[in-house]
Amino acid sequence: YIGGNDSMDTVSKLSRYAETVNSEIRFIGIPKTIDNDLVLTDHTPGFGSAAKYVASTVREIAIDASVYDNKKSVTIVEIMGRHAGWLAAASVLARKFEGDNPVLIYLPEVAFDPEQFLADVQKAFEHTSNLVVCISEGINDGNGKFVCELASDVGVDTFGHKMLTGSGKYLENLVKARLGVKVRSIELNVNQRCSSAMLSATDEKEAIASGSFGVQAALKGTTGMMIAFHRTDDADYHITYAPEDVNLICNQEKTVPLDWITGNGSDIGQQFIDYALPLIQGSVKVPEE
């Protein structure tokens, strides 16, 4: 069964049920989620390609923002991520040098204060006139209230998760009202998870390898496991695969380590860059027919 957290929950339920009825069916979970939020695995297939898309797109947005006049402007980019900010963190890979755009990056792992955000923007204007700010859709006040909920009520999906939209638009209106500068918000939307134009070759290779490992594990009688990725301590990037108990994985959520978040919650540190760079390497030729 291939997928993310809810899929691993399904593997857990099916494998436990099969055991109670003495079924010989084997259930193996293969991780696949751009959210990169599964525990007991270094990362998940899909994240590398999505991170590459985010970094490349934010780079292009930053270039576009820089070509206009020198009047102060803010471009807010809203990126997927309800409780884990892995994808928004990947926007740091768009930078060419220290201080480059995106100047500010906010993740749901750290409580978001709108007043501090405005202060951060004003301080950033001391160094550049064209700011790009990247945010996770799930930025929140630290007490369970999402920033997007400050603007409107939201519904829930079939799994009971709040459906988030509007964090970028809320901050756009806030900046416009309080700072009076040119501002726009951009929601990267579904292309983050479905674009095939910038696939990571590393991501593709590991997805195939983990699927193959999972099939072999099932043929050996393994069940109720997820194929996890383990990064070795070698100087060069290297991954090994191993089955992990899916019951210890489902309904858990891996978030970005707090010590990887810097700038008092408004930036991403070198630890994340070192972690993510190997995952976006290599290109895959996109079929043209």
Predicted regions and their residues:
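C-terminal non-catalytic interaction/assembly regions of soluble proteins
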Residues: 149-289
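Mobile beta-alpha loop/short-helix "lid" or hinge segments that flank ligand
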Residues: 28-33, 190
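Flexible loop/turn segments at secondary-structure boundaries
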Residues: 8-9, 36-37, 83-85, 141-143, ...
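Accessory alpha-helical/coil subdomains and C-terminal extensions
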Residues: 1-3, 9-28, 44-184
